[in-house]
Amino acid sequence: KDFIGWLWTLKVKVGHSVRTIKDIEKITKSDLKEFTSYLSYRIIFCKKNKLPSLNSDLDKVSNKWNKDKFFNAKKLEQNNRFKSFDSTEFNLEPDLKESPGCLRDFQTALWILEHCFKIKKLEDCIKLNLFTREEIVSVNKSYAHIKGLRYILNLYSNSNRLSFENQLLLAKKSKLKSSKKSSAVEKFMRVFF
């Protein structure tokens, strides 16, 4: 409670909940977003002897969403998100969290790999011949780049949107310089896309 209060004081928005396993089972049975949130949960405080039991209980909750149902629901969710961000406005000023190719797509892929294939780390995909090492390196580099941009943007703006103003800001923070051929913002957005 004190930790969350401290974060709020710092104006950090953080998703959080305090729930029993029974609460989690009830909520996640029919709510995809709630279920997905438990695929990437982070424990702030837990007694060591309770952790194996917690993981076992969460595995039971996980079994309520079969692989096909989960995959199809995530695909539908992604298609709906793509439709809502399919406009000239969002093509010119993408949202670092929700626009196609941004954080939510990386997260969706990770959630599908974890739930449907029991893969905890991208590197495990190499052992299963799902991806090459080069592909994993490229994905990790892109994911880190988008997360880094969002982090910097969130330090200066209360938005995930790469508005023209924010593009200028991030181009400047990236120390890009304009040239005769292209402006710093054009260079920044070329790297982004």
Question: What do these predicted regions represent?
Answer:
Residues 56, 64-193:
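Conserved nucleotidyltransferase catalytic core and NTase-mimicking acidic/glycine-rich helix/loop elements
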Residues 43-64:
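Long, acidic, intrinsically disordered low-complexity segments
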Residues 2-49, 148:
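Conserved catalytic core of two-metal-ion nucleotidyltransferases
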